[in-house]
Amino acid sequence: MKIVSLLCSALLFSFSFAANAAPLIIKYSHVVADSTPKGQAALKFKEVAERLLPGKVEVQVFPNSQLFGDGKEMEALLLGDVQILAPSLAKFGKYTKKVQIFDLPFLFDDIDAVGRFQNSDKGGELLTSMSDKGIFGFGYIHNGMKQLSANKPLRTPRDAKGLKFRIQASDVLEAQFKAVDANPQKIAFAEVYQALQSGVVDGAENPWANIYTKKFHEVQGYITESNHGLLGYMVIANDQWWKGLPDDVKKGLSAAMAESIAYGNQVAHQEDANFRQKVIDDKKAKLVKLTNKQRAQWREAMKPVWARFEADIGKDLIDAAVAANQKPAKQKKTEKKHSDKK
């Protein structure tokens, strides 16, 4: 009887210990503000994950490079010092050349075309293209189309000649600015404001969300509405960490991630115009609108960058991205109907 009693006590203790086990800590690090689409997506992931897996997980969100800057975060992920990141798509060139497709200038007509490509089979393949490097991709978060800013108006490519532009660590972006005889400078995102303010660089490229939330428009005299490229993110995890999670935890986190990505992209779509208007209302930088002819000149000047990186990226991927610019027939009819009513 005494042995049975001891066994029962041991079982009760083990059940109690399991019930009171500390939650799995998940560190989600990023380099932008909470108010941006990526920041909002990260907070939504925390909210949904902790609701779906009560007591099992605790998501700690670190915005604004609080934990790791954009120059160190990938290394930290692979070392297991952080579990989830959402780096800019420009950061993946050293892990797979194919993701460089998102840096090609004037590839996508608008953010809807980006979404169509990313949701296609070709776009989905890129999420699993780095598993051999220890990176697991969940999905894509949009920020917006990029605008050019500088301390002088940029209307034609020759206006950029000789200017120093901050870029991310991307060979494609480096080639993009060299194509217009500008001087690209690789600078960490957290250092961009100071670099612009002090004149270390003359200009930069950013979507409206980053321009406003990081106050770049306060230290740049002009913003050219170029929509020349995409700034987006891939939400990723350490592949080994992800594969080692229990199935129920993976299921809950996958559901939370899907909801958070959809939410982040909804915020991006809604807030892009709002951030643009806020920049205009602040009246600290002048907006430069390109004519169709001027925009065509920028496109023509930067288009050779495609051919330079076609072999690395793959012509099939580039063709699929170009095809995504074709709007579905249903969308075309809806737009025509609205146009007829005007």
What would you call each of these model-derived segments?
Residues 22-113, 121-342:
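N-terminal secretory/targeting leader peptides
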